[in-house]
Amino acid sequence: RLKYLGHLEVIHTIERIVRRAGLPYAVTQGFSPHMRVGFSSALPVGTSSTCEWYDLFMTEFVALDEAFGRLAAASQAAYIDVRTPALTAQLTRLSYRIDLHLDAEAPVSADEVRAAIDTLRAGHGIDYARGKKSKRLDLDHTLVGYELTAGERPDHLVLMLDTHADNEGSMRPEILLSAADVLLQGLTPGVDAPIVSTGMQDLVTICSYDVERQNQACEDDEGRLVSPIPVRTCGFAPHTR
């Protein structure tokens, strides 16, 4: 499966596996430190093997079974062809978790936030400014679905976004939040208050928020979500309202 990798490519693959496994590997001294790992004789390209060895020096003891287990868990059982499309072209479904922290004395309700998002969806998009350019966030194209639930406190809501991304555009959660905030004030986005892309937004009805991208997945020809690693399925559940 990997016989067409050159020796240096094999070395780099093993080094990445060790890092993913979280093993406490040692590094060499000198001007250009690197992982202290030694390999047996190199194989010619095109020659496969079922018995390869390497020495890995570590800074602390790790039991043999644990080390092998962590290495195995960090090793993908697949080879990705170099002609495979770039991840930016493959990963077209992205999920976000947004924690909304509201004013404890006068919090907006989940129903109000939901109504604001639904109003924006009905308008199909959000016009906003980014620097000197005017842009539009196409919600028909980028917002697949969402789920809004109560958080741990009355002034905390959790917004889950299921989004689509490609060369035509991708979701910008901060633009969606900024436009929803304007609606929650009883104003019209882009008319009574401009929507400007400035990274983290300074909102009125939302004291603060935290955005976390929680998953990235591919879509197959039938629209099913799959992992970019062909032999694995992706634990990504789309969120719908």
State each model region's role.
Residues 59-64, 103-107, 166:
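Helix N-cap motif at beta-to-alpha junctions
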Residues 24-27, 66:
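Flexible helix-coil linker/hinge segments at domain or subdomain boundaries
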Residues 64-75, 109-121, 176-177:
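Short amphipathic alpha-helices in soluble, non-transmembrane regions
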Residues 101-136:
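A contiguous pocket-lining binding segment that forms or flanks enzyme active sites
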Residues 4, 122-241:
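Core RNA-modification/binding signature centered on pseudouridine synthases
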